[in-house]
Amino acid sequence: MLRRVAVAAVCVTGRKLRCEAGRELTALGRIEARGLCEESSKPFPTLTMPGRNKAKSTCSCPDLQPNGQDLGESGRLARLGADESEEEGRSFSNVGDPEIIKSPSDPKQYRYIKLQNGLQALLISDLSNVEGKTGNATDEEEEEEEEEEEEDDDDDDDDDDDDEDSGAEIQDDDEEGFDDEEEFDDDDDDEHDDDDLENEENELEELEERVEARKKTTEKQSAAALCVGVGSFADPDDLPGLAHFLEHMVFMGSLKYPDENGFDAFLKKHGGSDNASTDCERTVFQFDVQRKYFKEALDRWAQFFIHPLMIRDAIDREVEAVDSEYQLARPSDANRKEMLFGSLARPGHPMGKFFWGNAETLKHEPKKNNIDTHARLREFWMRYYSAHYMTLVVQSKETLDTLEKWVTEIFSQIPNNGLPKPNFSHLTDPFDTPAFNKLYRVVPIRKIHALTITWALPPQQQHYRVKPLHYISWLVGHEGKGSILSYLRKKCWALALFGGNGETGFEQNSTYSVFSISITLTDEGYEHFYEVAHTVFQYLKMLQKLGPEKRVFEEIQKIEDNEFHYQEQTDPVEYVENMCENMQLYPRQDFLTGDQLLFEYKPEVIAEALNQLVPQKANLVLLSGANEGRCDLKEKWFGTQYSIEDIENSWTELWKSNFDLNPDLHLPAENKYIATDFTLKAFDCPETEYPAKIVNTAQGCLWYKKDNKFKIPKAYIRFHLISPLIQKSAANVVLFDIFVNILTHNLAEPAYEADVAQLEYKLVAGEHGLIIRVKGFNHKLPLLFQLIIDYLTEFSSTPAVFTMITEQLKKTYFNILIKPETLAKDVRLLILEYSRWSMIDKYQALMDGLSLDSLLNFVKDFKSQLFVEGLVQGNVTSTESMDFLKYVVDKLNFAPLEREMPVQFQVVELPSGHHLCKVRALNKGDANSEVTVYYQSGTRSLREYTLMELLVMHMEEPCFDFLRTKQTLGYHVYPTCRNTSGILGFSVTVGTQATKYNSETVDKKIEEFLSSFEEKIENLTEDAFNTQVTALIKLKECEDTHLGEEVDRNWNEVVTQQYLFDRLAHEIEALKSFSKSDLVSWFKAHRGPGSKMLSVHVVGYGKYELEEDGAPFGEDSNSREGMQLTYLPPSPVLAESTTPITDIRAFTATLSLFPYHKIVK
């Protein structure tokens, strides 16, 4: 798969960038941390590097001087105190700058301005779907409405606290099925095979999307993002991580708004979220909020750049947050590999710096060396946070004139120091060293075999109109016939390949651009890694001999043009973040297109880049646990074990010669899946507001809704093939995983052309059935859907493929289990959900051994008896939709189920009291612990679910302030609204480190917080209560950004068989009926003497977690193969107040079960 970034989507645990073929890839080097308060559009997890909790610190792109952004011919200089009548005179048309090229499908208007202090801004007016308004609304009308709305706004933020990473993680437990993209995606390009090889994504992963739909699709927020054209490259040598630390510190109060967490509290109160990221050469801040409060939010946010306080006391506490972030990042192979790669740069190059920062570099070492970190922070801010380095993007349902007035008034106060921006472009060829063209063996944390081949090229940003690396990566990452991966898969040497440049700062900056090819190897592939590398070099040599092909370029260009022309709108906060970075890179006319379109075919530019990809300039990194014992070096910051070897002489000599090409490697054929018909279809049945059931038989049913809102030539097809066979045993669950992964493997080559033509598909091994998801341009979508069903019908596997997939699945299960947060979830759901097979059960069943015959028998039985449920939405007729279901039924020719099957687990009813399940983490090199305190409620109504959402929303800010800001217990701290197979509850989770705290201490502090929170809500004013209710209503009231959000919400109702498509309306109605006493009574009832409380501790390894003999965990530890739960007893103090769970099966065997329950009324 090629690695090219389209529009980035962000998420809680990290950042994933969606690649051209519609799958996901993790961006190497992106330092990130996401707040859980607003779980962005799509859970695209990422690597994490330094960043505030809600911060994503990123090592991002080049920092080139933008072209054409000064005043120029049609440039516009915003003036302080501009004449109001002149401004109003322009407002009636609300027409944007014609120079800025936008998609015909984009209803927004754009205007570029430059303030007198040098700050450049892009104003985005989104007046589409404004009820009762048109694009001709005047500033006066807007301001009048604003004043009226603000009359009842209560500005008491005093009690609301900092929430950099907290936020209500309102996610349904059933949605938490494994391989939900937030929790179980691999954090490494080398490991992306797990995306397809995990079965962890159950059908309730779809429910996770419902949560996100609830939070982000219900309102199109106003949003802003600001990019400072300076990042971690500017870190002083004696204070590593200072740029990242400053990005944290500017949030901590300002001269105008001194409350330390005032901005976060203001956003939280008004349904907003914020984040920030530190990159190599850029630092980005962004937020969104309800439109009504956008102007005030802009003023509060701008103070970060006008006069932040950065008081000494806050510095000491925030260093702990940065250090916790670093500790969380240490077990990531992606981060470890990146740090190792940076260390290969020549001395003096900034890539060799430690961007993260930690307590050692920001506190202890400075103290030892008499460095005043506080003074240096302010000095760094004054030097580098200058207006003329900044690009700002604001988007709201205001006229362009209104936005210009606000931006000019507020952001003109940012100082301009008049100093030139730091420039690193003279530091070229950082990796032109003898150490680069070597073989590096690395011992990873995870179970993985991977080979990464990397070249460091001259900076490529100036070639954005040609995008030579995108052209090359499209071919190298191709998975169809004649491709590298197709050949390696046939040899059973590789499972996945990602090639190209992810456009992060680590991969592309003003000093170099990386081109890398990461290949996930099988066990056999690891043994033949030199042959694998040779295959890559043969393919590249073939491309070099052929030279650039205009046919291929034009095919890529056509695919990109189609996607741009018919693009769907994205979440505003993601969009403005992307645009403010684009403003640093592209001239004004290409702000919206520069990162996506291929403008010019220049074969000489492509050839110049292609001809540098030769073996003599390549760096080889081989990751494998098999390297243990032969790696005698250790990277300073992440402790990565590695060795450096000369490439074997026989291969060196071969690659120097005119070696033969491989006849099995060739260019891809012409793509038959590229859409050419974009006609919008007419209705062939009555229009409905919600999906209607148009087919209902014993074998299946179909829900359908024709799109008449977004009016794009795309469709979404989703099917759930339900079978009772899957959950009958742990072995069956594993066989189902193997089946889905082999099916995905079988489809990889024939379906790849569809994938790159913007037709996306995913097969998900759900808890109760196979989920098929297909979307894209409707013209050729039936071809892809039929291809999937054909391969499902004719499923087969060779012994070699079966062995390859089962071996990889062992690694996948292992990699999931060694993460404390995912093990904690597995333990919690194993306790709560009756008859659930845990990940450890599955791992053990796989280790016990399964045969190909058992798989084929399982698949035969699975296909013989099913119930199929589907949803089709978009630019398709009802007749065409029925054809999809008919095709499934006719091809599979299955019998109906003998009885209706529930698509959820029964849940155990916890006894009253406090129950504690404390287990050791399974990665003995990981200091991270996870503590979750869960309160079970029971079978509740939709009204009570909504009340619980409101409770958690109230809880977010004080939870974060108490547990992270004041107690500094950990980086990730959040309350969560839990829906576990229809049974309600709420929890508070803290990720901490055993090097700093004992898990029981954290548990007690969580209880301390909940006690203080009870007092807080009792003293809540009616105004403060109503403000929060209004904020949640607003989040549920606004329109979807694009069709996919509406589909996600509807699919969640279908896949859980709840069918309450107007759920949001019912929740809004419930919210309007709540009083403060409802909230207080509900909380007290669940915290009282009869409360049902479960604490789950996954205990890391460090000095605060000692075994009974006083030895730290992990010393003289057993082999990593021992994947058993090791229960730990509570301390004598905690034992007095808790009931320990030391055998989950024995504990749950004695408990009653709740009846199956759905939250539908």
UniProtKB/Swiss-Prot annotation:
Domain of life: Eukaryota
Major enzyme class: hydrolase
Keyword tags: Cell projection, Hydrolase, Metal-binding, Metalloprotease, Mitochondrion, Phosphoprotein, Protease, Signal, Zinc
Binding site for Zn(2+): 244, 248, 325
Modified positions (Phosphoserine) in chain numbering: 85, 91, 93
InterPro entries per record: Metalloenz_LuxS/M16, Pept_M16_N, Pept_M16_Zn_BS, Peptidase_M16, Peptidase_M16_C, Peptidase_M16_M
Annotated catalytic residues: 247 (proton acceptor)
Catalysed reactions, as listed in the record: Hydrolysis of polypeptides, preferably at -Xaa-|-Arg-Lys-, and less commonly at -Arg-|-Arg-Xaa-, in which Xaa is not Arg or Lys
Composition bias, Acidic residues: 138-209
Tissues expressing this chain: Highly expressed in brain of early postnatal mice but expressed at a lower level in the brains of adult mice. Expression is high in cortical neurons, and lower in neurons in the striatum. Very low expression detected in the corpus callosum. Also expressed in the gray matter in spinal cord and dorsal root ganglia.
Disruption of the gene: reported phenotype: Knockout mice are born at the expected Mendelian rate, but high lethality is observed within 48 hours from birth. Surviving mice are smaller than wild-type animals, have several neurological defects, impaired motor activity, and deficits of working memory. The cerebral cortex is thin and lateral ventricles are enlarged. The volume and proportion of myelinated axons is markedly reduced in both central and peripheral nervous system.
A single BP term in Gene Ontology: proteolysis
GO cellular component: dendrite; mitochondrion
GO molecular function terms noted in the UniProt entry: metal ion binding; metalloendopeptidase activity; peptidase activity
Record-linked Pfam families: Peptidase_M16, Peptidase_M16_C, Peptidase_M16_M
Swiss-Prot/TrEMBL cofactor(s): Zn(2+)
Major location category of this protein: mitochondrion
EC number(s) given by UniProt: 3.4.24.61
Signal peptide from the UniProt entry: 1-18
Cofactor comment text: Binds 1 zinc ion per subunit.
Gene3D superfamilies: Metalloenzyme, LuxS/M16 peptidase-like
Location in or out of the cell: Mitochondrion; Cell projection, Dendrite
Record function comment: Cleaves peptide substrates on the N-terminus of arginine residues in dibasic pairs. Is a critical activator of BACE1- and ADAM17-mediated pro-neuregulin ectodomain shedding, involved in the positive regulation of axonal maturation and myelination. Required for proper functioning of 2-oxoglutarate dehydrogenase (OGDH).
Quaternary structure and partners: Interacts with BACE1 and NRG1.
Family affiliation: Belongs to the peptidase M16 family.
Designated name of the protein: Nardilysin
Organism of provenance: Mus musculus
